[in-house]
């Protein structure tokens, strides 16, 4: 690949930086790593040195791809993202920016002559010509900062995400003189979410780009009279993919969960709305009572597609592709007409991701996990589904971000061998890698082998299990093994790449890595996925033991460890009390130890209420206060999955919590947790460690005070990996 660097690019980058910020406050630039690898061995340091490619955008003329790459400095304990460009065939890569502060959200102008981007919480634009950026102009001045933005098709308007005060209060809200007092005050549920207290709510604002510097007083909150009451976009992961501009720029479709407090905590009822800019009216798109997200307009604006789950309270329900016809208000006496709502993907027993309309509006492209691999599919208006990418291609493909004139799709892909790169997928399903961001590093590594196996379960089903072998594997030599216990519990072990649970890294340390897609995984149809709900101590645990039995039968396997995060951590704590002598050591990250206590302290209550055995037994009566006296309802919420439920599945669930079997613990265990984890609070990890100590079990506790459910800061991540492998080596290699 040709790299266009040198004086011209650096001069343009310097000009850009001088126009954006005070040079004295500019942190050091972080660029690609020049790491040299000894003996071809992958290490945690190698993993963290890789560039992370994201957010590709095809230019309006189809000639260029704009994308971002983040590089990490372990010494500075941070990452920095800059913008890059290549031709649509992957050639002539050029670095557009060289900033010490991250630049993200790069977007083309409608004529392709300007690039807009986000830096330091504000939006800028710079002219683009001959592969270079000119002097940048600041477009926004929003004191609360901007997290993301999108432009209308004609660039005359902008949507941006910022924040307003949330439901959690501080002492100074009651008495301004107490400006140094620190406390959080809540009067309803959902007072914290994922890793933060709800001091602020994300809101989406609409503003004109042709009226000078965009400021809050020139912006319209898209929620109108509901401003400050609800989230838009949905926390904690949502962004502006939950909004969509109509092709003529007169309507905005968006996804919003218009609930708060207890109602929010127990419900997944998120709906699609259409905001009509000329009239200021908002219209509800009728759909189910579960998650409805990610709306996408057809090229002519006559149809709207979106993703939908049918059942309220079930966040792992099948993700369906819905479509509706939308007629302009001008054709219906000033009222927007939404008709012909259809479930388009009924023939597909899989979750739809990232729908993208074809240019002619006659099909929709999307990605989906099917039979353990994520592929690219198309669907017609009649609901006929066709897989484009080969069934035997061991990659995970993302949804297309662009389509060339010859019908070639531009997308991303990854595998267990390499992180995300850009790829071109031709109409016949063949594909070519476009970018090679980390080739200079990965080419130094010794190759390894992966096998696809099917394990027979206790009830006679075939379970897809990936097995990775160490580089230069010799079957006459004995190796320790790691069995990965999946989190979720709904998720999949496919060909994804992770910067924490990296299976290539594990194999490189001399381990055989076993990845069983046990009950509850999402790449094998909804029946396989749903079986786990209400059956945590059941068949999926037997699936793990079946996979362990399979690998231990191999003559080249010595000791076996079981490791997992989140539900995988729950699985570790549960198996610790029932496995007998199957495993030689355990590692649990952010695991559930006491299911009953977790119900009292987690934040998204719909999840345990459903998955702990309540299933569809959810109801809310507005205005109802206090216990209803039926042993299930509390505070107006019917909680059939609660510890006080009288249904058999929840009673079995809590009776078999990992904490119930601690007297049988005898296997060395490492417990890791982040203190900012509000999904599974860190006292769960402390309780597991304390228990192991009291049982006389060799154990270790690692708590990261600044991390959430994930470990994100570079030095913390490095320490996490070192601790992980030190523990495995101590108990499995000795």
Enumerate the predicted regions with their spans:
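C-terminal motif of bacterial Sec signal peptides marking the signal peptidase cleavage site
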Residues: 17-20
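Predominantly five- to eight-bladed beta-propeller fold
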Residues: 26-30, 80-81, 163-214, 218-225, ...
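Conserved beta-propeller blade repeats
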Residues: 50-65, 100-116, 143-158, 191-204, ...
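Non-catalytic accessory segments flanking enzyme active sites
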Residues: 55-57, 159-161, 184-185, 190-203, ...
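Short loop/turn segments that connect beta-strands within beta-propeller blades
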Residues: 87-91, 127-132, 209-213, 276-280, ...
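Cap/lid segment of the alpha/beta-hydrolase catalytic domain
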Residues: 437-559, 565-566, 600, 604
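Active-site-proximal cap/loop segments of hydrolase catalytic domains
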Residues: 515-734
